[in-house]
Amino acid sequence: MTGMTTDADLRELTVGTGAGGEQLGTDMVLNIGPQHPSTHGVLRLRLVLDGERVVSAEPVVGYMHRGAEKLFEVRDYRQIIVLANRHDWLSAFANELGVVLAVERLLGMEVPERATWLRMALAELNRVLNHLMFLGSYPLEIGAITPMFYAFRERETLQTALEEVSGGRIHYMFNRVGGLKEEVPAGWTGRARAAIGEVRRSLPDLDNLIRRNEIFLARTVGVGVLSAAQAAAYGASGPVARASGLDLDLRRDEPYLAYDQLDVPVVTRTAGDCHSRFEVLLDQVYVSLDLAEQCLDRVDRLTGPINTRLPKVLKAPEGHTYAWTENPLGINGYYLVSRGEKTPWRLKLRTASYANVQALATLLPGCLVPDLVAILGSMFFVVGDIDK
């Protein structure tokens, strides 16, 4: 050894930087997911961090893509209902409903009035079940365990009612083109009304536990603020958009089924932060319980069939139509194109979760890493609904 420095000694070699290597040396690139306990499915977030502050965020979707839209093209109009309720497993009844509404619109079919009101009652109960899941899981994600038990207690009460009428706990498959699968069991509306009353009496336990909890407020108030302009730009809808001040609800503004015969209160907030999104979801539960009860009252006063007799092979006429519904997580759209065959030529889904999750690219930059999961959970999405 001579102690002399050669050109070879001065050469620098960077090994294994992978994706995002250009930021190494100043910022850190961090991947959240695709497997992560705070997501309903497999979502990946590619983050660039400066210390504990997020500089940029990119939601990477597609890990749960199962080709639902392509599968629709090789299933007849009865079989697609089986697929329709699986991309958002927390809103199964609402997803079935959107598909059959599109088919019925293309067929020019009038659905029996009793079936219409039963659909509305079941859709509102399904909305409550969806919201209760997030009302329990969201506090859990930021460290509050107890609300989960209260939320699941109320879910089980309503889940029993829906299981009795449809036979399914998650995938109901109760909608049919032209109505519903079958008549509800004798006395079911009374039992469903009793379940609604029980949930309404018990819900304040969850409400009082978490809404004004000091620690919960500290973690959510002023965190992850999404302005009304940003929500509109991303096409956000549902509780996420209404928490930012977008007063939009299809049940009131573009009514389908018989929602035009109901007074539908629309729950909104203006702060656009995590706490506002949680409050909108919580207050919507009270509204949906009231709406479901009104629908059941109407069902009890109606007689007549629950569905429409269909031909053995159902073919929609050539043409196209678009139906949209106010799903629990936001606006879902169904664009149906038919060539006069027994299967759809194309059925395009517009899902609320896909639009809402895009806002993370705006929400996350500037936040601290500890707030990241609080913001992520408050967007209330299902990854199957994103990836389809």
Curated annotation (Swiss-Prot):
Keywords: Cell membrane, Membrane, NAD, Quinone, Translocase, Transport
GO molecular-function terms, A-Z: NAD binding; NADH:ubiquinone reductase (non-electrogenic) activity; quinone binding
Membrane topology term: Peripheral membrane protein
Enzyme Commission number, as recorded: 7.1.1.-
Pfam families (alphabetical): Complex1_49kDa
HAMAP family: NDH1_NuoD
PANTHER family named among the record's database cross-references: NADH DEHYDROGENASE [UBIQUINONE] IRON-SULFUR PROTEIN 2, MITOCHONDRIAL, NADH-UBIQUINONE OXIDOREDUCTASE 49 KDA SUBUNIT
Protein name, as recorded: NADH-quinone oxidoreductase subunit D 2
Origin species: Salinispora tropica (strain ATCC BAA-916 / DSM 44818 / JCM 13857 / NBRC 105044 / CNB-440)
Gene label: nuoD2
